[in-house]
């Protein structure tokens, strides 16, 4: 199955800005990989909370629509809240 997530590039980086994003129901994330520069992104929590329940979300390639470009990625790591059904941060790796 193919998944597409709309995202924006983050300009503010750090703990404080990440907390502000989470309070606004956004998820901070990063895309990295060998030979390419890391990209800090942000997307809506509702865009990922439902599709991450599917098992193939973690094993298949995802498409991130990033400012008019489609970037192919795979999920590398995902941090979840300890007891709330919330995703706190996602690490993607270039596919």
From Swiss-Prot:
InterPro entries linked = Rbsml_bL25/Gln-tRNA_synth_N, Ribosomal_bL25/Gln-tRNA_synth, Ribosomal_bL25_short, Ribosomal_L25_dom, Ribosomal_uL5_bac-type
User: Which portions of this protein are annotated as coiled-coil regions?
Assistant: none
Q: Which CDD domains match?
A: Ribosomal_L25_TL5_CTC (cd00495)
Q: Which Pfam families match?
A: Ribosomal_L25p
Q: Does the keyword Lipid metabolism apply?
A: no
> Per the record, GO CC terms?
cytosolic large ribosomal subunit
List GO BP terms, alphabetically.
translation
- GO molecular-function terms, A-Z: 5S rRNA binding; structural constituent of ribosome
Keywords, comma-separated and alphabetical: Ribonucleoprotein, Ribosomal protein, RNA-binding, rRNA-binding
Provide the family line: Belongs to the bacterial ribosomal protein bL25 family.
Function summary: This is one of the proteins that binds to the 5S RNA in the ribosome where it forms part of the central protuberance.
> Subunit notes for this chain?
Part of the 50S ribosomal subunit; part of the 5S rRNA/L5/L18/L25 subcomplex. Contacts the 5S rRNA. Binds to the 5S rRNA independently of L5 and L18.
Protein's UniProt name? Large ribosomal subunit protein bL25
Origin organism is: Shewanella halifaxensis (strain HAW-EB4)
């Amino acid at each position: 199955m193919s998944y597409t997530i709309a995202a924006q590039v983050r300009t503010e980086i750090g703990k404080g800005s990440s907390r502000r994003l989470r309070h606004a129901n956004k998820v901070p994330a990063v895309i990295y990989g060998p030979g390419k520069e890391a990209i800090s992104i942000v997307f809506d929590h509702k865009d990922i909370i439902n599709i991450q329940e599917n098992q193939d979300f973690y094993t298949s390639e995802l498409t991130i629509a990033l400012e008019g470009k489609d970037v192919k990625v795979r999920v590398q790591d995902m941090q979840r809240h300890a007891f709330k059904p919330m995703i706190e941060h996602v690490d993607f790796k270039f596919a």
